[in-house]
């Protein structure tokens, strides 16, 4: 089979995205035009702006710093200039073919700089005839379609597990008499405190900082990649997390506002950011696991956010909102522990299934890469 070698820049002439950058980040699902990034997030939201909309489709958007790519066949605007819009020379390549080919390029992007013009566009690739490209794309699409069906099934199972978790939590707390509900502040050893704000210039080294993307469903994300921030000794003392603390997301969209986590272990002095709130419970009055399970229920989170202040893109809660949240508190600590243990047994089963699903997701990603590598073997 005959191949012709080209630099990527010959196949993918670029355009700067400046003319298509969104003016406002007041996004809404009710608006028409997606705002894109080339990274994993892809669609950041939708805008109602009507000018500067890119419509010369299809194209590939290229993250100039990470080299991530996305194939786009719908009208869009962009968030920033940190990307290149890559047009496709269809005299030489089929759009999907060159997009798939980009996915198997090995490239070191560890240095924080722009890559397309100086280096990435100069990478050479061997390209077959258009007919052969079409055959390869058809085969990849066929295999990916089967893989996508399996991934859809995994996603459905994940959703069902989330529903089951909430059902377990709801059942555990449903029979507690209403007279046992008290404001959370009555069992606090240390009242809620907002975290620390530091500008970007302080980030890069120093102490780990827990941010709002670092905890979900009552737990700090396993293997969470902490950012680091330079701090004074008094800042570390004031904002340090301690084992047994509970953190709450105090500023976010309504779908994430009020999510909590129990701090179970710390490898080194760690602080929490300004969009996070921290409080400490009195273990003589309330079992920490019991409290965390309750706050992880839909109705427990509702208590935390019922007086939230809403703006266009985000909402917030304050220390008073958290302190006044009602929580059922049986006087007997042993009764609380029994409830927590029963929940834990059911949740452990869910977690095992969840881990299996995550492994299957990773295998699907590996299979996708394997399909691409085999497709482009010359």
Spans of model-derived segments:
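Sequence-specific dsDNA recognition surfaces
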Residues: 5-57, 74, 78-81, 185-200, ...
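Ligand-binding loop in jelly-roll beta-barrel domains
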Residues: 91-92, 281-287
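Non-catalytic DNA-recognition/assembly elements of restriction-modification systems
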Residues: 1-19, 26-41, 126-137, 145-146, ...
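A short glycine-rich beta-alpha junction/loop motif
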Residues: 77-84, 110-131, 198, 268-277, ...
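Interdomain signal-transducing alpha-helices
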Residues: 98, 133-136, 291, 339
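Short coil/turn segments at secondary-structure boundaries
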Residues: 21-27, 112-116, 181, 197-205, ...
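Short, ligand-facing micro-motifs at secondary-structure edges
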Residues: 18-23, 42-78, 92-100, 105-113, ...
């Amino acid at each position: 089979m005959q191949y012709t070698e080209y630099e990527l820049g010959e196949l993918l002439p670029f355009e700067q995205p400046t003319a298509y950058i969104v003016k406002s980040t007041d996004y809404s699902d009710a608006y028409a035009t997606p705002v894109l990034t080339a990274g994993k997030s892809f669609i950041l939201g939708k805008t109602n702006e009507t000018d500067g909309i890119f419509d010369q489709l299809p194209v590939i958007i290229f993250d100039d710093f990470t080299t991530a790519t996305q194939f786009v066949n719908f009208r869009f605007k962009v968030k920033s200039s940190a990307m290149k819009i890559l047009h496709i020379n269809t005299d030489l390549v089929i759009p999907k073919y060159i997009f798939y080919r980009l996915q198997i390029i090995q490239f070191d992007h560890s240095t924080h700089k722009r890559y397309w013009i100086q280096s990435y566009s100069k990478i050479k690739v061997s390209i077959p005839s258009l007919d052969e490209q079409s055959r390869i794309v058809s085969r990849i699409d066929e295999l990916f379609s089967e893989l996508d069906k399996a991934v859809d099934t995994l996603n459905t199972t994940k959703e069902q597990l989330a529903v089951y978790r909430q059902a377990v939590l709801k059942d555990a707390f449903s029979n507690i008499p209403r007279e046992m509900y008290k404001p959370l502040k009555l069992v606090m050893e240390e009242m809620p405190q907002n975290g620390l704000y530091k500008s970007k210039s302080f980030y890069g080294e120093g102490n780990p900082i827990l941010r709002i993307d670092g905890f979900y469903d009552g737990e700090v994300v396993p293997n969470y990649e902490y950012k680091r921030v330079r701090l004074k000794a008094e800042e570390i003392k004031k904002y340090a997390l301690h084992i047994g603390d509970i953190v709450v997301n105090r500023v976010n969209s309504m779908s994430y506002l009020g999510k909590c986590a129990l701090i179970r272990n710390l490898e080194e002095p760690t602080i929490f950011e300004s969009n996070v709130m921290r409080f400490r419970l009195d273990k003589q009055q309330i079992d920490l696991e019991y409290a965390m399970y309750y706050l992880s229920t839909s109705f427990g989170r509702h208590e935390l956010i019922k007086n939230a202040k809403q703006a266009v893109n985000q909402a917030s809660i304050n220390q008073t909102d958290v302190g006044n949240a009602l929580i059922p508190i049986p006087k007997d600590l042993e009764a609380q522990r029994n409830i927590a243990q029963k929940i834990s047994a059911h949740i452990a089963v869910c977690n095992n299934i969840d881990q299996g699903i995550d492994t299957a997701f990773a295998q699907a990603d590996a299979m996708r890469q394997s399909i691409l590598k085999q497709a482009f073997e010359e």
